[in-house]
Amino acid sequence: FDGGESQHTAVMLQPYADEPDALPDYQVDEKLVKAAVLKAQAKGVDTHAHNYGDATVRTYLDAVEAARKAYPDSPSRHTSSHNLFVSDQDIPRFAALNVTMQSSAQWATPDPTMKRTAGIVGEDVAFREQFRHNSVLKAGGRLALGTDWPAAGYAVTYRPLDSIQVAVTRAILPQYGKDQFTPVLPPGDECITLDQALKAATIDSAYVLGLEDRIGSLEVGKLADLVVLEKDLHKIQASDISTTKVKLTMMNGKITHQEQ
């Protein structure tokens, strides 16, 4: 729906701090997006929108709200992707409109890229609105973790354990050294629990795909998609999650990886 803050193409509610005259427009016409969401809702089709800026997030939520009101019985599922910046006003709307917040959590680290981002949008915005995972969950919303691979931020990774660790710590992964401007990416209270991160990486991601009845949890009748780790993640330090070895991987009941 929009671009990214580093190119000044994310649509924001306030001017860019480093280029106040930069006034980006949506990558896709706003009226077209609203019409598409409405039509999808009417047909029972899901939507998934790329929303970086806080203004783009709001416009997409507005589109979903109008569609929900027009066709309240539709089974359509709507997902807002990325959500780098979300304003306080829009946090409760994710739950109210049953819109999933999809996030590439491995990006939420206090690395040089995020420091540059703070200079672009302004620290007051960045350190208040970035990756608001905990706020959405506390308001009753749904969070799903995804990679956005092969796109990459400072952390060039698609590994689920990397994303889970960063969602819990908001700190740089150990394999990327200590090139950080602060121990935890602000706002620090947006860290989530391990159980919340695991849920976001499994059953709630399956929900986004419309496959929660087949995958995403270990239940009788579902596909045997699972991993066996060398350690119980609940019994180790959060900073060790990403380096925990995968002993076995199974898909559809078939072993696809096994450590010898």
Show the residue positions of the predicted features.
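Active-site-adjacent helix-turn-beta-strand microarchitecture at beta-sheet edges
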Residues: 1-46, 91
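His/Asp/Glu-enriched, well-ordered alpha-helical/loop segment
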Residues: 35-47, 55-78, 82, 89-92, ...
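Non-cysteine beta-strand/loop elements that form the S-adenosyl-L-methionine
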Residues: 1-11, 98-109, 169
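Extracellular/periplasmic ectodomains of large secreted or surface enzymes and adhesion receptors
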Residues: 259-260
